[in-house]
Amino acid sequence: MNKPVHNNEHRRKRFNKKCPFVSAGWKTIDYKDVETLKKFITERGKVLPRRITGVSSRFQGVLSQAIKRARHLGLLPFVGED
């Protein structure tokens, strides 16, 4: 009998992403560190999801609060720059 052929194109490769903040030993994220915050937002100014950045759930909440504070104080734009 013929064995079923598996289509490997549809399989996803799983990567173990480590949280960049945990691996660097960060305790908190500073809202004034704009260069770090810019790495976690899109060109349009949206916060990147955890599945893309690999940030832990604890730091994702802290990160989004820091981005919101920086936006409110005018350090980051609400909408991406053209």
From Swiss-Prot:
Superkingdom per UniProt: Bacteria
Keyword Electron transport: no
Cited SUPFAM superfamilies: Ribosomal protein S18
Keywords: Ribonucleoprotein, Ribosomal protein, RNA-binding, rRNA-binding
GO biological process, one term: translation
GO CC annotations on file: cytosolic small ribosomal subunit
A GO term for molecular function: small ribosomal subunit rRNA binding
Pfam assignment, any one: Ribosomal_S18
Known partners and oligomeric status: Part of the 30S ribosomal subunit. Forms a tight heterodimer with protein bS6.
Function description: Binds as a heterodimer with protein bS6 to the central domain of the 16S rRNA, where it helps stabilize the platform of the 30S subunit.
Cited HAMAP family: Ribosomal_bS18
Family the UniProt entry places it in: Belongs to the bacterial ribosomal protein bS18 family.
Protein name: Small ribosomal subunit protein bS18
Protein species of origin: Chlamydia pneumoniae
Gene, per the UniProt record: rpsR
